[in-house]
Amino acid sequence: MLWILVLFALAASASETTTGTSSNSSQSTSAGTTNTTTPSTACINASNGSDLGAPQLALLAASGWTLSGLLLIFTCCLCCFWLVRKVCSCCGNSSESESKATHAYTNAAFTSSDATLPMGTTGSYTPPQDGSFPPPPR
């Protein structure tokens, strides 16, 4: 969880730095005419309508909305996987562990040789093998 916060902080500082430098250098005066471009159109003008290059892709990858989008996709995939696992119970052993605990509890009386004696009795006790549970009172 901490690395996600670190990525958000890095993305925020990177986008802050790049927008600050592009807005400062976007105003240029040549031969008495003023050409002002906004940071949103500077990237489009720099690419001349061609495919995005490595610097543009790096800037896009470092932006905050891309990281939050990836975080949203990761969260959705994780929730969907958890939901499918709960509904189908084919990938994990969540319901299997409950059934194992139940069977271990019920089978202990029939298979254990050192079963505890009922209160108030002395001597040895053998659990019934015919499936009757609990044992009849003495």
Swiss-Prot record:
UniProt lineage: Viruses, Duplodnaviria, Heunggongvirae, Peploviricota, Herviviricetes
One Gene Ontology cellular component annotation held by this UniProt entry: host cell membrane
Source species, domain of life: Viruses
Membrane topology recorded in Swiss-Prot or TrEMBL: Single-pass membrane protein
Organism: Human cytomegalovirus (strain Merlin)
Biased composition (Polar residues): 113-129
Keyword Lipid biosynthesis listed: no
Keyword terms, alphabetized: Host membrane, Membrane, Signal, Transmembrane, Transmembrane helix
Region forming the signal peptide: 1-15
Region described as Disordered: 17-37, 113-138
TM ranges: 64-84
Localization per Swiss-Prot or TrEMBL: Host membrane
Coiled-coil residue windows: none
Protein name: Membrane glycoprotein UL139
One Pfam family named in its UniProt record: HCMV_UL139
Presence of keyword Transport: no
